[in-house]
Amino acid sequence: MGKLKLIVMVALVATISCEKNAEEPFEDTDSMTYVAEVYVTWNSESPAWPDKDAHFSWMGGATHNANVKFWEIGTLASPGIDLMSITGLTTDLILEIQAEVDNGNAENIISRRHWFCPRGLFHRLCREPIFEFEVTKEFPLVSMVSMLGPSPDWFIGTESLSMVDNNGRFIPAMTYELYPYDAGIVSDNGVNDCCDREPLSIPQQNVHLITPETGETIGPGILGRIVFTAKPE
């Protein structure tokens, strides 16, 4: 009986130990690799579905500190955001980011030159929706954007999303929901099909979230999500 009791106690201790280790955060470090997986839920069942080839376009962005913002609601879009939101190309945005890398405000550039597509869309420009990037404690914020294609000047993205918690530790996993934004470049009044580009807005409008009140023909609501998962060394 004594031997049996000892075996049971050893097994119980082992079980508690395993559960504790599973709940403990990984060892704190100064840098962390994250896996980002993009899920596109914008599809033919969405309101005002524009086109059978609708997708998220190139993804561009960076890790950075709080001294810089590459886009922000309520402010005018930069030329790089302009080009991205209208054409899907992130080339000018990457140049803006590189300038902030040189200024010491950004660190790692995120650039994926392919489409992120909803399930069921088979197109030669669609690629794997998973990529990795590195974040450091010195540059813990992540901003990345992608045009809603086709659209006048609409996009999705993250803006200064922190990958560290209030205690300064890297967040193990996070799901970020993607809402549509209007870059304020093209005068889209919600009457025409979303793929038609009317004259440029003069004056240029501020970047804003697309809501039922803003009058665009897309959304509103969540069009996808990005799942971030830490990948400890």
Language-model features, listed with the residues they occupy:
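Structured domain cores in non-transmembrane regions
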Residues: 27-33, 42-156, 160
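Bacterial Sec-dependent N-terminal signal peptides
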Residues: 15-32
